[in-house]
Amino acid sequence: MAGVRSLRCSRGCAGGCECGDKGKCRDSSLLGKRLSEDSSRHQLLQKWASMWSSMSEDASVADMERARLEEAAAAEERPLVFLCSGCRRPLGDSLSWVASQEDTNCILLRCVSCNVSVDKEQKLSKREKENGCVLETLCCAGCSLNLGYVYRCTPKNLDYKRDLFCLSVEAIESYVLGSSEKQIVSEDKELFNLESRVEIEKSLTQMEDVLKALQMKLWEAESKLSFATCKS
């Protein structure tokens, strides 16, 4: 009929819809729309997931950096323990730190441990700009290593050094108190001091006495055997 528009469904069917069911065409259209919406939601979720993952990674990196800085700050706050480079005896710590002398390569401490022996023989300093300073030599009580000196008398311009212990950087080693990463004594270098030397010498003397006793018994046995041979 003229003037009657040809109706088409979503599949392109004309007239009364060759699909046979207008409801099915409508459902198909709605299904496509929902699939499109689901696809958009999926893309949006992926975008959010990507953004969240990126933010999580940034937060993780930030946390690691913060932890590293906190650990470094804590390490700086921990005191240093100064050891004799010869026998690893503790000599002092940074809690008694006064200053460092770059020109003489020394550190100045207010006090030291009992492992530092002070030679009471006084002598004048021969260092430049220390004219008039009276010094006493410092040695390690364990291995007798020369550690430095202590200022006993000073001119007026060096009064701040009086009674301070000056330890040579070359004669000492240090480690951070509470640090488990660094060993006080290296694996390939055993701790050797005066006490261990005395124990070793004592053991050697005992072994020597045992060897002498065995040698005497061997000599007696050889003498008896030789006498028996001659008699027969």
Curated annotation (Swiss-Prot):
Domain Mis18 per the UniProt entry, residue ranges: 79-177
Q: Which UniProt keywords are given for this protein, alphabetically ordered? A: Cell cycle, Cell division, Centromere, Chromosome, Isopeptide bond, Metal-binding, Mitosis, Nucleus, Phosphoprotein, Ubl conjugation, Zinc
**UniProt keyword Ribosomal protein, yes or no:** no
Q: Which residues, renumbered to this chain, carry the PTM Phosphoserine?
A: 36, 39-40, 232
Enumerate the Gene Ontology biological process terms: cell division; CENP-A containing chromatin assembly; chromosome segregation; pericentric heterochromatin organization; protein localization to chromosome, centromeric region
A family per Pfam: Yippee-Mis18
Which residues of the sequence carry a binding annotation for Zn(2+)?
A: 84, 87, 140, 143
Q: Which GO terms describe its cellular component?
A: CENP-A recruiting complex; chromatin; chromosome, centromeric region; cytosol; nucleoplasm; nucleus
Among InterPro entries, the record links this protein to:
Mis18 (IPR034752), Yippee/Mis18/Cereblon (IPR004910)
- Crosslink Glycyl lysine isopeptide (Lys-Gly) (interchain with G-Cter in SUMO2): position given as 161
- Disulfide bonds, paired cysteine numbers: none
Source organism's superkingdom? Eukaryota
Where is the major localization of this protein?
Answer: nucleus
GO terms for molecular function, please?
identical protein binding; metal ion binding; protein-macromolecule adaptor activity
Cellular compartments annotated = Nucleus; Chromosome; Chromosome, Centromere
Q: What does this protein do?
A: Required for recruitment of CENPA to centromeres and normal chromosome segregation during mitosis.
Q: How does it assemble?
A: Homodimer, and heterodimer with OIP5/MIS18B. Identified in a complex containing MIS18A, OIP5/MIS18B, MIS18BP1, RBBP7 and RBBP4.
Q: Which family does it belong to?
A: Belongs to the mis18 family.
The name this protein goes by in its record: Protein Mis18-alpha
Q: What is the lineage of its organism?
A: Eukaryota, Metazoa, Chordata, Craniata, Vertebrata
